[in-house]
Amino acid sequence: FLNALKNFAKTAGKRLKSLLN
């Protein structure tokens, strides 16, 4: 479960960076 949460955070972070750029 924790691993999935980390993976989700990584994906969200990448999408946020893409939107900001």
Curated annotation (Swiss-Prot):
It comes from the Eukaryota. GO terms for cellular component: extracellular region. The keyword Ribosomal protein does not apply. Expressed by the skin glands. Keywords: Amphibian defense peptide, Antibiotic, Antimicrobial, Secreted. Coiled coil: none annotated. GO terms for biological process: defense response to bacterium. Its main location: secreted. It is found in: Secreted. Disulfide bonds: none annotated. Has antibacterial activity against E.coli HP101BA (MIC=6.4 uM), K.pneumoniae PTCC1388 (MIC=7.3 uM), M.luteus PTCC1625 (MIC=4.7 uM) and S.aureus PTCC1431 (MIC=5.3 uM). Has no or very limited (<3%) hemolytic activity at concentrations of 15 ug/ml and 60 ug/ml, respectively. Belongs to the frog skin active peptide (FSAP) family. Brevinin subfamily. This is Cyanophlyctin.
